[in-house]
């Protein structure tokens, strides 16, 4: 870790960049809520999130240069990488649907993640350290980075599913297409064929509700996250076999990662084969959100198993 001294005050530039990212997300949060209420322009919040993502990118690059290895070797680095992934996913989703609702429901996830890393973790966990021999492998980037990106996509998708309840309250709605179709990015200017008229010229515009848009974006985000999680689990099994001679050891992190995979597999199964849409699959997505929290934060902080980054027992 590189520290700069100024009048007997030392600071780590990596941690400082994390603070800067937190501040920009903190400014973006109320603007997002005001934009939902119609009192502000959501593009301002989007700009602040983009600036935060740039700070996080710079932070990860600087830590990589300092440590000599990809910056996902401890809890602090992985939280910063997770925040980077969440902000990037949010920007992509907002590009697909320019609505303040996306920013209002997604920004808190990134803010809590970088806030926890910057203000809750002790200094010894914020510092870089040499990799243990088992982690000195090219699989580190392949496995851990893919897993963290999957967590980012799944967390954002789950929060968007929760937004379905916030937007529609107790109302019931049905997505006006199939589970495959509802997963597509839909814009309000899309066209649909009036089935009551056999004339192919009878094409009319249809306005999709906020709940339908949220459901659509959530479905896509969770699908991407599930695919990444699958790749991450497979690469982790291959790496484990090379490092420890076992494909699967039922380590607490492995077990909870499998539970996470099963929950989101059930989500996709109910949408694709059972035709569930709207609030029913959203319940599974929200359950998956809490499973990720236990898998990632809970196991790590308890310092249990080979995958934990430790805190209470190691600090």
Swiss-Prot record:
UniProt keyword Membrane present: yes
Subcellular localization(s) per the UniProt record: Cellular thylakoid membrane
One Gene Ontology term of the molecular function aspect: heme binding
Residues spanning the membrane: 17-37, 72-92, 101-121, 146-166, 221-241, 255-272, 282-302
One Pfam family of this chain: Cytochrom_C_asm
Residues in coiled coil: none
BP GO terms, sorted: cytochrome complex assembly
Family named by the database record: Belongs to the CcmF/CycK/Ccl1/NrfE/CcsA family.
Listed name of the protein: Cytochrome c biogenesis protein CcsA
Natural source organism: Prochlorococcus marinus (strain NATL2A)
């Amino acid at each position: 870790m590189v520290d700069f001294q100024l009048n007997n005050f030392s600071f780590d530039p990596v941690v400082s960049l994390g603070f800067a990212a937190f501040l920009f997300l903190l400014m973006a949060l109320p603007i997002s809520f005001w934009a939902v209420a119609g009192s502000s322009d959501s593009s301002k919040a989007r700009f602040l999130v983009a600036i935060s993502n740039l700070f996080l990118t710079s932070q990860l690059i600087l830590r990589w240069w300092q440590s000599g290895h990809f910056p996902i070797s401890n809890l602090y680095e992985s939280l910063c990488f997770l925040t980077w992934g969440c902000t990037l996913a949010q920007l992509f989703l907002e590009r697909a649907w320019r609505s303040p609702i996306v920013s209002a429901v997604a920004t808190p996830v990134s803010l809590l993640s970088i806030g926890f890393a910057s203000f809750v973790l002790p200094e010894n966990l914020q510092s870089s350290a040499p990799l243990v021999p088992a982690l000195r492998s090219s699989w580190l980037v392949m496995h851990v980075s893919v897993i963290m990106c999957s967590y980012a996509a799944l967390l954002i998708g789950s929060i968007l599913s929760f937004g379905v309840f916030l937007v529609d309250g107790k109302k019931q709605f049905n997505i006006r297409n199939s589970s495959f179709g509802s997963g597509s990015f839909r814009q309000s200017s899309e066209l649909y064929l009036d089935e009551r008229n056999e004339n192919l010229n009878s094409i009319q515009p249809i306005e999709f509700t906020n709940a339908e848009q949220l459901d659509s974006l959530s479905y896509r985000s969770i699908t991407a996250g599930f695919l990444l999680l699958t790749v991450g689990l497979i690469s982790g099994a291959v790496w484990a076999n090379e490092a420890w001679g076992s494909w699967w050891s039922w380590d607490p992190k492995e077990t909870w990662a499998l539970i996470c995979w099963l929950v989101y597999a059930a989500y996709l199964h109910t949408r694709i084969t059972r035709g569930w849409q709207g609030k029913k699959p959203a319940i599974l997505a929200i359950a998956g959100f809490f499973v990720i929290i236990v898998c990632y934060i809970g196991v790590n902080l308890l310092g249990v198993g080979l995958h934990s980054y430790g805190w209470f027992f190691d600090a």
